[in-house]
């Protein structure tokens, strides 16, 4: 809907994954009817990828992209804006100036993706594990498994972006490597976290495995990356004032139905099992709470309600 508002919904390609143990949802029909200008492609799992979802759910992204790029090899010649489905674009979104070169432009995620992030995790190692950890170089180990080096990550330290990407010269083989790489990174980091840190949350953010795999595979094929302000984004947990300065709102950063443990928030994780958010009284609590109104999360929730009412959607 937000792409339609800024005149780009005719370029939208939506890839939808159906696990091998589930039938394709009929609920998508009403969305497809609403946006005939967009392309919707359904992929039923025929490669037992569903068995990997217990390890890492985001693996379905490179899997679907691998299949789509195989079916559409000329996509390699296009600049492709790649993002999650929980994104809202604002009137300030404009990356037209960055489409016609070979540079891959990224949102700024340096703080939790870069080489510096890896090195700083030393500070969170359990005291009794410090000496053993000193014998390891986790960044070096992981980058070698993908096919690059620590040095490449260090050279590109300030352009270690992710979350939203404007990709160039990308093909099926690229997504196959990303698919394989994100499982390697996820499992390796989980092992490291169990060995050297108090818990998973204190260790490396292994849920970012696909972001590292995309980034490092760009460098593997000698691609250039640049973090640019035009792709800066607001988190759902950010103050609403930040939305005025960014072109993208990513509904991430909320981990519970209570933001900061106190005021109500729209938490997408509460609805993964099929609960209808529009029949959940909590949604109105979010909409009407004066504190929640100070955050981007409130804007995201109001946009959901607006679209539902505008098109009389059923969940």
Model-based region annotation:
Residues 1, 53-62, 174, 206-210:
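Phosphate/oxyanion-binding active-site loops and adjacent basic polyanion-contact surfaces
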Residues 16-21, 82-84, 231-236:
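Short amphipathic alpha-helical segments embedded in low-complexity Lys/Glu-rich regions
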Residues 201, 205-206, 225-226, 230-315:
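C-terminal catalytic/acceptor-binding lobe
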Residues 59-120:
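GT-A fold catalytic core of metal-dependent nucleotide-sugar glycosyltransferases
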Residues 23-24, 50-51, 88-92, 97, ...:
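Short catalytic/ligand-binding loop motif for oxyanion handling, primarily in non-cytosolic enzymes
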Residues 1-57, 68-77:
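N-terminal anchoring/stem segment of glycosyltransferases
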Residues 68, 106-153, 158-162:
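Surface cap/lid and interfacial helix-loop subdomains adjacent to catalytic sites
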Residues 136-252:
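Catalytic core and acceptor-binding pocket of nucleotide-sugar-dependent glycosyltransferases
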């Amino acid at each position: 809907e937000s792409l339609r508002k800024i005149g780009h919904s005719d370029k939208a390609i939506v890839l939808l994954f159906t696990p091998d143990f589930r039938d394709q949802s009929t609920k998508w029909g009403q969305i497809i009817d609403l946006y005939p200008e967009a392309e919707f492609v359904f992929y039923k799992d025929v490669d037992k990828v569903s068995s990997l979802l217990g390890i890492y759910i985001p693996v379905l992204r490179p899997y679907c992209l691998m299949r789509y790029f195989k079916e559409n090899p000329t996509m390699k010649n296009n600049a492709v804006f790649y993002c999650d489905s929980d994104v809202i674009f604002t009137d300030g979104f404009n990356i037209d100036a960055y489409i016609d070169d070979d540079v891959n432009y990224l949102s700024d995620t340096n703080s939790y993706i870069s080489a510096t992030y890896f090195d700083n995790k030393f500070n969170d190692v359990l005291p009794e594990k410090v000496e053993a950890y000193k014998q390891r170089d986790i960044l070096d180990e992981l980058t070698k498994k993908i096919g690059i080096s620590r040095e490449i990550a260090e050279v590109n330290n300030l352009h270690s972006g992710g979350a939203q990407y404007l990709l160039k010269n990308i093909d099926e083989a690229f997504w196959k490597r990303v698919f394989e790489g994100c499982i390697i990174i996820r499992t390796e980091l989980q092992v490291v976290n169990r060995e050297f840190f108090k818990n998973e949350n204190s260790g490396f953010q292994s849920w970012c495995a696909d972001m590292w795999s995309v980034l490092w595979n760009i460098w593997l094929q000698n691609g250039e990356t640049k973090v640019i302000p035009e792709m800066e984004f607001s988190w759902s947990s950010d103050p609403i004032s930040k939305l005025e300065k960014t072109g993208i709102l990513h509904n991430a950063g909320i981990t519970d139905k209570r933001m900061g443990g106190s005021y109500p928030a729209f938490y997408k994780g509460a609805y993964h099992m099929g609960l209808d958010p529009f029949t959940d009284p909590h949604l109105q609590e979010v909409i009407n709470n004066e504190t929640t109104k100070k955050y981007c999360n409130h804007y995201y929730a109001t946009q959901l309600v607006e679209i539902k009412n505008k098109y009389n959607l059923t969940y």
